[in-house]
């Protein structure tokens, strides 16, 4: 059995103790699920979906809490505190996520949020994040066609528009003239491929193109008119008031 640090794993309960449950971690040995995370009614033999990380003493432990992001993800996270070693991000777990100074583009400030990539440090085997997200974006040719639906994470405002991360893998750009509503760093929205350039760069639009866009707009307009007609019909006239 192979476990994945920094990700959700389904593991079997093999032992119950006063301070929690031990899970079968295969070659990694038994992994503690502290008592505060043990679901009510859980018993030996049950399988649980747990997130694996290192505690404050660098021991492999499990939790049934779901973090805001997992290893391999890009996310928009807030700085909880800083010290002489780096910044620590709130990612929904008791132990905050470390960003060493070498992984910061600009010195991170407490209370501010940043787009980061989560990974396991090869040297220390610690979970950490990096604000130097470019190095983690794929340089492969994107497998998209014009009109394909994608999920984007808004990354950075530029003179041309907004840089976005497409499907947690590729870099894309929403041009200013394609914006029909405000975007903000950290937004996750549904979008569409406008163009795949020969160099692999992606142009993104927030609305469907061609006939589908016309059909969608027509449906929205119809619903809007029907809603307004209903309000007009049901609203009291001045004489009734």
Each PLM stretch: what is its role?
Residues 1-4, 56-73, 132-145, 177-181:
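Short boundary/loop segments of OB/S1/cold-shock single-stranded nucleic-acid-binding domains
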Residues 11-13, 45-56, 77-79, 112-123, ...:
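Flexible glycine-rich surface loops and low-complexity tracts that mediate binding to linear polymers
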Residues 19-22, 85-88, 160-163:
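Short aromatic-glycine-enriched beta-strand elements
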Residues 29-41, 96-107, 171-182:
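Beta-strand/loop nucleic-acid-binding surfaces
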Residues 155, 217-232:
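Short amphipathic alpha-helical interface segments
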Residues 175-210:
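Long, low-complexity, charged/polar intrinsically disordered regions in eukaryotic proteins
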Residues 205-223:
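Short alpha-helical segments that sit at the start of domains
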Residues 233-238:
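Conserved small/polar residues in nucleotide/adenosyl-binding loops
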């Amino acid at each position: 059995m192979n476990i994945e640090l920094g990700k959700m794993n389904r593991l079997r309960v093999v032992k119950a103790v006063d301070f929690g449950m031990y899970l079968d971690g295969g070659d990694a040995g038994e992994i503690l699920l502290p008592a505060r995370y043990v679901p009510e009614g859980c018993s030996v033999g049950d399988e649980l979906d747990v997130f694996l990380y290192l505690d404050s003493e660098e021991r492999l432990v499990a939790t049934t809490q779901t973090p805001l992001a997992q290893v391999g993800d890009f996310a928009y996270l807030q700085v909880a505190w800083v010290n002489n070693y780096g910044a620590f991000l709130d990612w929904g777990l008791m132990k905050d996520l470390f960003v060493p100074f070498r992984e910061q583009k600009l010195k991170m400030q407490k209370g501010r949020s940043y787009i980061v990539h989560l990974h396991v440090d090869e040297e220390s085997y610690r979970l950490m994040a990096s604000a130097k997200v470019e190095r983690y974006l794929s340089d492969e040719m994107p497998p998209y066609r014009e009109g394909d639906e994608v999920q984007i994470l808004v990354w950075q405002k530029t003179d041309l528009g907004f840089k976005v991360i497409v499907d947690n893998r590729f870099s894309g750009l929403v041009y200013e003239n394609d914006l029909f509503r405000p975007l903000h760093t950290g937004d996750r929205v549904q979008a569409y491929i406008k163009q795949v350039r020969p160099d692999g760069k992606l142009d993104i639009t927030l609305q469907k193109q061609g006939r589908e866009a016309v059909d969608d707009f027509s449906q929205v307009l119809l619903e809007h008119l029907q809603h307004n007609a209903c309000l007009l019909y049901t609203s009291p006239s001045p004489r009734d008031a």
